[in-house]
A protein has these predicted regions:
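Non-ligating segments of multi-cofactor redox enzymes
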Residues: 1-205
Length: 205
């Protein structure tokens, strides 16, 4: 049976610490932008944590919601991409081929979750920050769209190791950076097609 990767987030466990956001930046070579660029709506965050407030001061309750690419089954971003840079792969992921992208930004306009980002400039990594770049992830250039990939580089590496050892992937052995960094284990990742996986059970609960 083919894999179908999915994620479940327990909002009651999320504390809004944004460790997931930081881990995502480090793992996927996401550039930081200046305050001026951020004010123009050019912030690069594959994952963000939204805050919702209930009640009136001093009895205020805060709820947090991590938001990232939903890897939609019928993704509207894929339908509008003229070069098929946005497409579904064999694992059910909404994948992005950077070399195909011509920067029309149609996909960003079609995305209902506002989780696709355009590179308005070539990223800069002043020394010694260039030493922290992850060699498993390509650095995107100006004019290219990017978004959450569920850390596809980790998925590919885990599948290669499993194939080499003639075994199936074990549930829980593979985690994207956000799930690995979450201190409360609010983010659960796994194979939705495996009914015994934790993520599949959570989605049914």
């Amino acid at each position: 049976m083919p894999y179908r990767w999915g994620m479940a987030v327990d909002l009651d466990k999320c504390t809004g610490c944004e460790a997931c956001v930081t881990a995502c930046h480090a793992e996927n070579n996401i550039p930081t932008v200046s305050p001026q660029q951020s004010a123009r709506g050019r912030t690069m965050h594959w994952m963000r944590v939204e805050r919702y407030y209930e009640g009136n001061f001093p009895d205020v309750r805060v709820k947090f919601r991590p938001v990232l690419c939903q890897h939609c089954d019928n993704a509207p971003c894929e339908a509008v991409c003229p070069t098929y840079a946005a497409h579904h792969n064999e694992d059910g992921l909404n994948a992005q081929v950077y070399n195909r992208c011509i920067g029309t930004r149609y996909c960003a306009n079609a995305c209902t979750y506002n989780v696709r980002f355009f590179n308005f400039f070539n990223p800069e990594w002043p020394k010694p920050l260039h030493l922290q770049l992850n060699p498993d992830v390509s650095v995107r250039e100006v004019g290219v769209m990017e978004k959450c990939t569920f850390c596809v580089q980790r998925i590919k590496a885990a599948k290669i190791e499993a194939k080499k050892d003639h075994r199936e992937l074990v549930d829980g052995a593979l985690q994207p950076a956000c799930a690995q960094a979450c201190p409360t284990s609010a983010i659960v990742f796994g194979d939705v097609n495996n009914p015994e996986s934790r993520v599949a059970r959570l989605m049914q609960s």
